């Protein structure tokens, strides 16, 4: 999912694409095996029977690929989380280095930083954020333009979706740190922002404190909670750094069995 050399998110493949690729590969092997079995049909009729091979093909696709968690239907929220699941394609979860599991700035608005299973799949099985959308195979997140005005700055209502590549060279401010005066105008107070890295580095962005008016020409998030998954957004005060509380809450929501009348 993430290319650590450039901090770019790689192209996102849909479940249907992965399934089609696995099915085509399995069918090719099945045809070869079945054709060879036909030659020994008279000696052993079971050797050419397609049903055992079809069963083996199906088991390989469902159990040895990335579809093992394709049917989490404990409750409605578990289904929603499953629909928004994003898996990192890797050969083995047990041998994947820790560098592939870490959070990165390009994840903002695309991958929820909290909703990931513990254990070997930590950081490899993730959940798409609320505002994230797959456009041309890339995970994009919505922003709003910041414009310079006579009173300082104002935020446009127009939504612009950007991929990680589109973000290069632009400034992005934290909308929660912007403050307004009594007249409803934004004040030139310090804010937290993601700005281009002035030094030559593999990381294209750094997090810094800048004046609000310096954000003119840049962008802010379309919604304060767009970096959270739909399930994580239900946790009260999820914007704080209490990771354990949020993780436990997510597990409880997904595993709850609701009572019926």
Describe the role of every protein-language-model region.
Residues 3-115, 125, 138-261:
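Long, charge-dense accessory insertions within large macromolecular proteins
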Residues 132-138:
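Covalent nucleotidyltransferase core used to form phosphodiester bonds in nucleic acids
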């Amino acid at each position: 999912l993430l290319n650590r050399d450039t901090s770019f998110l790689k192209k996102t493949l849909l479940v249907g694409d992965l399934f089609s690729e696995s099915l085509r590969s399995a069918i090719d092997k099945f045809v070869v095996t079945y054709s060879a079995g036909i030659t020994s049909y008279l000696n052993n009729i079971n050797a050419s029977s397609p049903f055992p091979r079809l069963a083996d093909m199906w088991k390989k696709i469902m159990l040895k690929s990335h579809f093992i968690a394709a049917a989490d239907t404990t409750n409605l929220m578990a289904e929603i989380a499953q629909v928004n699941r994003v898996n990192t394609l890797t050969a083995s979860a047990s041998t994947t280095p820790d560098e592939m599991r870490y959070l990165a700035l390009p994840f903002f608005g695309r991958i929820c930083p909290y909703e990931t299973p513990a254990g070997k799949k930590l950081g490899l099985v993730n959940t798409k954020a609320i505002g994230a959308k797959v456009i041309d195979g890339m995970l994009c997140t919505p922003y709003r333009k910041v414009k310079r005005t006579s009173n300082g700055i104002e935020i446009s209502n127009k939504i612009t979706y950007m991929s990680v590549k589109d973000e290069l060279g632009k400034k992005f401010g934290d909308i929660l740190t912007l403050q307004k005066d009594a007249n409803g105008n934004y004040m030139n107070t310090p804010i937290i922002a993601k700005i281009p890295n002035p030094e030559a580095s593999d990381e294209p962005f750094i997090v810094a404190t800048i004046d609000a008016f310096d954000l003119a020409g840049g962008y802010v998030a379309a919604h304060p909670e767009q970096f959270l998954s739909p399930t994580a957004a239900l946790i009260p005060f999820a914007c704080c750094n209490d990771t354990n509380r949020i993780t436990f809450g997510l597990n409880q929501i997904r595993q709850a069995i609701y009572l019926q009348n």
